[in-house]
């Protein structure tokens, strides 16, 4: 019997699951809102809440713990500066999970996980290739 066993496996190996949640946490910190399946969003929530709490505490040791999870210096800096400042007065509950219907292909329940009091400008930043127009070719 599987009584008292917490967490889901998502049909992935341990390393794949850890990498997936690391990537999803990076995306959530960067864009402040992501759409994924509802079970993944529910399992991502405590990971991100813990990271934001580390950012609020500050300090080198906590920065190293956050980097071990995120593996991205820019996101760790955002966590320890922007997000730590934004949530300094909030004692937890930094994220919300909203239901977002069902996926077309397999009817999987979808959800949106977002940071509370998020910055709407952060959504979609640095996504995809950037087209640079050369001024010398226009004339």
Curated annotation (Swiss-Prot):
InterPro entries given in the database record: Ribosomal_bL17, Ribosomal_bL17_CS, Ribosomal_bL17_sf
GO biological process: translation
Keywords annotated in UniProt: Ribonucleoprotein, Ribosomal protein
Classification via PROSITE patterns: RIBOSOMAL_L17 (PS01167)
UniProt region (Disordered), positions on chain: 117-139
Pfam families, A to Z: Ribosomal_L17 (PF01196)
Cited SUPFAM superfamilies: Prokaryotic ribosomal protein L17
GO CC aspect terms: cytosolic large ribosomal subunit
Highest rank taxon of the organism: Bacteria
GO molecular function: structural constituent of ribosome
PANTHER family for this protein: LARGE RIBOSOMAL SUBUNIT PROTEIN BL17M, RIBOSOMAL PROTEIN L17
Record text on subunit structure and interactions: Part of the 50S ribosomal subunit. Contacts protein L32.
Record family assignment: Belongs to the bacterial ribosomal protein bL17 family.
Designated name of the protein: Large ribosomal subunit protein bL17
